[in-house]
């Protein structure tokens, strides 16, 4: 009897050993997967010093024609309304003013934005001159001249906002590679181009510092024609700070003697699709939305432009960039587009 029971006992012991080994293996696998997942999660969240993610909350542009408001946390303080403006200065301000006057922009301390709202100290701009994380977040606009501001009106404007706002202006674009995806509501400031840059269409930008002209980077295009067949060249300016009435809802033509009724819409469509929209092989932009009734024509005095060089300027704003992931590399004067 005992000889017959022995194999059974050995079999049970073996089964227990196998079960224990299986359990240990499963535990080890789970721990490994957990660690791997932690590493993957960490890899997906680059360090703040290298890349700064900013999430958009609201597209405010069509309400105020000023840009895009979003939410960002700086030094632990949440700024609810941050106006993104990648290059447009106020037209009544000399763009070279800062250099001529050795002008120093003054900036609110971002870590005291909340504390100072609603107090008399809000009007004391000079007390909060600081550059935070090298980003130069600015209240209001990148190029406001302090000597032209009625500080009482300015304070009243700030009180009327949902919360204090700061401008991510052209100075930020000059320092960082800026990636923006309007469709998914995010922006990233980085010290380098992303690893996925090979998926983007690279488009060289031109830099112009023409006095009196508010925008400084553009894409030079040819093949643009009027209805009478006359050829035109055009500078396509890229301005995320001007959201209302741009791109396919309208475009801004700054030629003094030219109106949209004179422009061959199919030629304009070809211009945009072939030279800007060539980021992908096939595009389906709503060209039919280019209704003359919704277009805005901005006329600038001829003395401010060299019309022998420039026939027309087209301003592409937020409406256009909704169709793309866009990367601005101002240091190298490059624009990258990928259809989203």
Short names for language-model regions:
Residues 1-48:
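Bacterial Sec-dependent N-terminal signal peptides
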